[in-house]
Amino acid sequence: MKALFEARINFIVTEKQIKRVRAPNEDWLQDDEVDVVLRFSNVVKLMNGIQNVQKLYLTADTIEVLSLCCESVPLFNNLKTLGITSEEGRGWQAMPVLGLLHYMTDKCGDACDCISREDKGRSLTSCPVKKLEIRGFRGTMKEMTMIKHFLVYFPCLKEMNIYVEEYDPTELRFPQVSKVIIQMMEEYNKLSSCNVQLLITDYLSEKWTAAGRIL
């Protein structure tokens, strides 16, 4: 897979499987539960095999599994575009290589309050990523903090597209919250050379228009 240009990784897991993987060393794990842990432990080989890709897209479940099963992630020297999906209840912000926030899991990245100020952002400073996509955005302050972290520490980042969650209720359903989020996005654009865009799909646009809402 050395010549692979683009990779989209989506591990399909259940809540029960995530719970098992989060506690792989517990004595009470039954044989079928141990099999789940062992199966996900092979993801290290997968990541090593795709480390030359230029475009990489990871779902929330995938990043949760990576953060729990991989002690380290290979350096993606050729990576230009990174797409990640945010999902409530998943540790998408627990992937240390991205410097993400400690939230749902017992591992944290260098944006976390657990990390000293001088060490924050260290894992991103040599990253060549120029474009970042975030999907499933819900308008929370945790997400906004993470977005600011990316803007500060990704040296090559030129474009960030943030897609609002389509189906589930988000904080953006409240007009006051939407106004604050838009103001913060505008401020991020002023302070950074990166073009930050908050985007909605056609489906969500039609849905909000029918409800008399405008972002």
Swiss-Prot record:
Q: Known SMART domains for this protein? A: FBD
* Disulfide bridges in this chain: none
Which segments does the entry list as coiled coil? Answer: none
Annotated FBD domain ranges read: 122-199
Family matches, as PANTHER family: RNI-LIKE SUPERFAMILY PROTEIN (PTHR31293:SF16)
Q: What is this protein called?
A: FBD domain-containing protein At3g58975
What organism is this sequence from?
Arabidopsis thaliana
Q: What is the lineage of its organism?
A: Eukaryota, Viridiplantae, Streptophyta, Embryophyta, Tracheophyta
